[in-house]
Amino acid sequence: MARKSHMYNAIPAGFESDEENMENLMSNLKIKRLEDITTGAGIDGCNFDATLDAKAEEFFKLFREKWNMYSKKKSPHLRQEFGRALMGHQDPLLLALKIFANCPDSSNIKTKSLSHFVLDTVCKLHKDFPHLGEGCDPNTSMIAFNFVKTSGLLALNNAVIHAYSLRQIRDLLLPKLRELLDNGLYKEVTQWSISLQLTHEFDMLELAFPLIAIEKLPLAEEYLDHATQQRLPFVKFLDSLLHKEKSVLELCEHLLDRYKNLKISHNVLSYRPMAKIVARLAKKYGFDDAVTPNYKFTKTCSYLHYLYREYEKTRMNLASFREVVSVHAFNHELRTDFVKYLASAGAHSEAIYWYTEFNIDPKDCPLEIETQVSQNGAGKASGWESPGKERCPSSRCDMYLTMDLPDECLIIVNKADEFDRMLYHLQQECVIYLDSEWMQSVCGDNQLCVLQIATGHNVYLIDCLARESLRSEHWRLLGANIFNNVNIRKVGFSMVSDLSVLQRSLPLQLRLQMPHHYLDLRNLWLELKKQRFGVELPFGNVNRAGDALTDLSLACLGKKLNKSNQCSNWANRPLRREQILYAAIDARCLMLIYNTLIERVSFIQAVIEKSIASNNFLRRGAHVK
């Protein structure tokens, strides 16, 4: 096979020729001649005369000697002396530029260099004495810009903008910025466009996209924060790169040829990183999933595939699996993709069930599914399970915690009078136990559906979707009398997520600045694990148990929690009995675990106080509205 011309010659180690190596090295040596920064620094390419008069030249000569002696010690008298010299001149801003041009490091400004010191000092003088800038003409402003345009020092650039009134000559600077853009200085041009308020002069493919391509997302976001008119089209453009049949690089390859000196990161120009950027920008700027259809499609496909894997591992029961799939497979493309995925996974009976349920055209189905349906008919070929049939044997179901209260103690609250009675009873309690269930959203915020509050004798399942019956005043009363009541201890597990969803979804007006009446059992459990020899509980030592709620239940109560209904359609009304029992057990088990720890751990009160003291829901994400 012919070798490509750009491939390296493979020479075994030790057989290299010194002469050949020297020739290769010499051919790669380049001498770069730095052009005098004064050349073409003025308006219309005029040169800048940086010649110092005799007095200024003598001062600068002596000052350079002092700088070389004292600069590393950062002696404050240097800045004072230099400032006095500038103030003694009739045009301090112009003198500073001349001295800057005579600095040996003026073509390569560093933060601790003499050239940086000169401009930084004159800018600070201007800040203290604004009248110094009154005589600054456009040519002086242009010279100042040309001196610092490629420094990359944002603080210095912004100081020069104010001291030398660069915003007054923005129209003259725009062609200069485009020259920098042609030379591949995307970062510098973006910073200048933001500082000079010129973001509207560039389109999204000139700055925003190349910044993404070189992995400068924070700067791209800062640019979009100012270029408000580009946010929506840019997010739509990035979403268009998330094609289900073509790669990101393939879709934007024709665009990359227009950029010069662009060091592209091929990592970011791939599906997963680009999808994260689309999701981040859409969330930041408040765009709904209608703006990002490609991202929503691929994200939903992945979620549907995940649901089947969870069902296959018996982590979801059949009813939960099918009702959640019915909600999220909302269009023809998602449905056909899901049926094809099931067929490729060998789940032919389930694929045929959804083929029938979705009423999919046979030509859109995999060949094996179409063949089975045509031979046996949809009903016979599928042989699907009844939604009421569980896939776990009775011996395995005995492992799970069951409800120990009668049905009349499981109270569904979806009317105003029921809510009032519940509120009265809750105010009599010293400790209550909280949990919540929400409907998973693929791209947006999760929808709170049920709030569970358990007491010693009842479990209240509050319907958070009963908006007509339960109004804002009901939720405010619940927040004021229960959640913000310091005399009622609220016990939960991983309460950050629950409180965050509650804050966002309901007008409870929670006051979480001093959450000393909340106890997170997860924090309590982790504190117990810090004990040197652990803590013995009725069914094991805490150090041999995991950190999930089902692990606490097993160690304290001897039974696990059946999570097969956790991921189900909690927005469906009425709820299935299995959902009601699952939600009630989740809250009830908190009380049983709490009581067990109180009884079996002699030093539990000290651990509780320590756990409560560590609460910081505001920092962790439960934001106050």
UniProtKB/Swiss-Prot annotation:
Keyword entries, A-Z: Exonuclease, Hydrolase, Magnesium, Metal-binding, Nuclease, Phosphoprotein
Enzyme class: hydrolase
Any GO MF annotation of the entry: nucleic acid binding
Positions of modified residues (Phosphoserine): S17
Enzyme Commission code(s) on record: 3.1.-.-
Cysteines paired by S-S bonds: none
Cofactor(s) in the UniProt record: Mg(2+)
Domain 3'-5' exonuclease: 410-602
Cellular component terms per the entry's GO annotation: cytoplasm; nucleus; P granule; ribonucleoprotein complex
Signal peptide (residue range): none
Phenotype on disruption: Homozygous semilethal and sterile. Mutant flies show accumulation of the longest isoforms of multiple-isoform miRNAs including miR-3 and miR-34.
BP GO annotations: miRNA processing; piRNA processing; pre-miRNA 3'-end processing; primary piRNA processing; secondary piRNA processing; transposable element silencing
Function as written in the Swiss-Prot or TrEMBL entry: Possesses 3'-5' exoribonuclease activity. Required for 3'-end trimming of AGO1-bound miRNAs, in particular multiple-isoform miRNAs, which represents a critical step in miRNA maturation.
Family membership: Belongs to the mut-7 family.
Complexes and interactors: Interacts with AGO1; the interaction is not RNA dependent.
The protein, known as: Exonuclease mut-7 homolog
The encoding gene: Nbr
